[in-house]
Amino acid sequence: MREIEISREPVELYKILKFEGVAASGGEAKSLIDSGQVSVNGAVETRKRKKIVSGDVIRFKDEEFKVRLAPL
């Protein structure tokens, strides 16, 4: 499981997928989410603007990412 550090919370799900290189663009990230290929905390998530906070676990295919807030 890979860790993702965010500088503030919440962050929209599609932005995390884009910035982590899972998707080449925001549009591609939204499409992946829309098609049910992404889960958050074990449940399929289809809301592109789902607010992600520290402690959330995102899964896409065989990749898992744990989100944590970066220290100040």
Regions found by a protein language model. Give the residues of each.
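A basic, amphipathic helix-loop patch mediating RNA/tRNA/ribosome contacts
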Residues: 11-54
